[in-house]
Design a protein with these regions (language model features):
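Non-catalytic terminal extensions of ATP-dependent helicases
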Residues: 1-167
Length: 167
């Protein structure tokens, strides 16, 4: 009963719900960040900002959300479904980035890779041809974030894989 008006909820309502449908929300499309599939397999997506980056890596049936604040340590914030990992990784970026950086970053998303980024990628074993126009500053930044943290990322993912296989 409503304390304000006295209406009795559900008293005369014997009807059954006949049809119900849920719609899936594509978290990546709704994100203010551009999530990139850096290996082209769909198993590792990453997004970066000026203050940090996030990654979601599929490990068997699980997905892991990894994040790192600029100058900080990479850490795992989620192990679960892909949606859970993406939501937590995206929330992390939303918390550490401000709306001004999103505006500044739009231009950066589509600008050609810089010579400095091409050089850094090359030092890490990734050759980018001067004629490969698919490489932008943003794509290079995402890839470099992975390469610079590869050892720790691989350790964390392998740890999850080992624990999951023991089950």
């Amino acid at each position: 009963e409503c304390p304000m008006c006295g209406f009795e909820f559900g008293k005369d309502d014997d009807s059954q719900l006949e049809e119900f449908s849920m719609t899936e929300v594509d978290l990546l499309d709704r994100s203010p960040f551009r999530w990139m599939d850096i290996f082209g397999t769909g198993k590792c997506v990453t997004a970066t900002g000026f203050n940090g980056f996030s990654m979601v890596i599929d490990v068997g049936e699980l997905s892991c959300g990894l994040v790192k604040r600029s100058g900080g340590r990479i850490r795992m914030i989620s192990i679960g479904t892909r949606k859970q990992a993406i939501a937590s990784a995206d929330d992390f970026l939303r918390e550490i980035e401000d709306s001004n950086s999103a505006k500044k970053g739009r231009r950066w998303l589509n600008e050609r890779i810089s010579d400095k980024q091409r050089e850094m990628l090359s030092r890490n074993g990734v050759q980018v041809s001067g004629f490969d126009f698919s490489w932008t500053k943003y794509k290079a930044a995402c890839y470099l974030n992975y390469l610079w943290n590869k050892g720790r990322v691989d350790d964390m993912v392998n740890n999850v894989r080992e624990k999951h296989e023991k089950r």
